[in-house]
Amino acid sequence: MLKKTLAVIAGTLLTCGSFAAEVTLRDDHPTEYTVVEGDTLWGIAKRFLNDPWLWPEIWQANSQIANPHLIYPGDQLSLVYIDGQPRLVKGQRPGVVKLSPKVRDISDRQAVTAIPLAELEPFLEQARVISPADAKSRPYVVSVEDHQLYGHGDRVVYVRGLNARAGEEFDLARATYVYRELPKRMPWNKGPARVVAEPWDSSGALTFGKLWTQLTDWRSEKSEHILGHEVVWVGRGRVIAAGDPAQVLMQHGGEEVKAGDLVLPPERAPYDSSYSPHEPESVPDNMRVLAVSDGIFRSGPLMVVALSRGARDGVANGQVFSIFAPERQIRDTVKHPEGDIRTAFTPSKAKVTLPEEYLGHVMVFRTFEKVSYGLIMDGIRPVEINSVLRPPRST
């Protein structure tokens, strides 16, 4: 999950104009390639293309076979030219393309996915982002059997606000962090530690500590608009007695359930992994890196980041973006050293704005309404919170 490194960054949604890029092959591209276990579409695309997100432009699916867009270990891919344009096809050698029906038994094989999904299981099966309305109204665990603070399999937990019948199943999840939306122009000047988000307290209690936090947030121009609340799955239970509180028998779980955990409907729809790397039609305005996983304030290749835009904004699985460090202002100490009385009353004259700096590429692999998760695919520098997303560009 996105741990203590979660930070919140901001924006409002506008879209920039659509863009397109020309397909260029790598100088060292092969003419044939046999897919092996562990391959990803991104990795295969990088063997042939300078820009892997242009995979849809080169992939030539055979419409005469079932699931023509899927690739399996053992498939032979060949580079051919159709109307003078490079295309990648299955089972063909360079030359004239001949499409013909072909039946194969693929029931025991897994199709190649865009990214290594097995390594992202916690983000696919355990984490989710719920809306502020859901966060306020969700039923919650008030106590665990035998007055214990924690409970796990074969224990009964007591849930308030659960309108359900005996036999219904629910997921139990733990509140982690809040994703907030902030102004475009960051009001802080004390480094990333100043913008780290606080853990989400799902109790709803108003304490002096919370009042102080709200006051300091207001003074820092922090917007109160919440993009979503992240929760982490801790178990599944079945209602054995309705009421308030209802009794829920824990059936299985990853962690012990405790008072304060939320009760959510199970996610029934299976994760759709049939997407491929592609460039977005546009980039939502001020789309930023909200948080990074397993790091303090920065992240590198094959690490997960949370992004400040989601399905509502047109973000979809497989979209690839470039990540840039945002513009920043520094003092021109060459022309205006510290203590220069010429800028005592006009300090802005001593400032110079450094341009955005390219950091790497990120591919979206899971979307929620206003937030999405992405995997950093490559980079030349660590990605930090508050980094801004742009259309994908060649490295």
Regions found by a protein language model. Name each.
Residues 2-6, 20-395:
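Surface-exposed, polar/charged interaction patches used for macromolecular assembly or partner binding
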Residues 11-12:
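Short, linear, compositionally biased motifs with a strong N-terminal bias
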Residues 15-18:
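N-terminal signal peptide c-region/cleavage motif recognized by signal peptidases
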